[in-house]
């Protein structure tokens, strides 16, 4: 996309991280698009926040790439600025290697994992440490 699109996505992503950190009651670290570094740390858990604009077909999903690390927690946030909706989370360990989540979305690109919001764990269970 254009430079404006790239900047808008970076700002949206950062605001999704702010929303998640605010909900979890942790400090936002003010870094953006740093590969290999978790977006947030919560009680020694590495969190990756995925922020998306709402899709017109209501088909948002949490995207996890093939190269994701095991045991990182991925959070899906929908940017409905000024509101940001946290739809849930999943531990990458339970997604990586699972055929039912693999997709290319019909595009000529490497597959990724796509988890629908209804399959995510509610975010309040992460906050309360009661997801296990």
Residue ranges of each PLM-predicted region?
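Nucleic-acid endonuclease domains
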Residues: 1-43, 50-132
């Amino acid at each position: 996309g254009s430079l404006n699109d790239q900047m808008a996505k970076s700002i949206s992503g950062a605001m999704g991280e702010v929303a998640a950190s605010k909900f979890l009651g942790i400090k936002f670290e003010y870094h953006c698009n740093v590969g290999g570094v978790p977006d947030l740390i919560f009680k020694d858990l590495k969190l990756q926040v995925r922020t998306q604009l709402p899709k017109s077909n209501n088909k948002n999903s949490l995207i996890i790439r093939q190269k994701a690390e095991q045991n990182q927690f991925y959070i899906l946030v929908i940017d409905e600025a000024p509101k940001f909706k946290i739809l849930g989370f999943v531990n990458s360990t339970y997604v990586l290697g699972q055929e039912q989540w693999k997709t290319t979305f019909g595009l000529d690109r490497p597959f990724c994992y796509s988890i629908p919001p209804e399959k995510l764990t509610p975010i309040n269970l992460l906050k309360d440490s009661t997801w296990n």
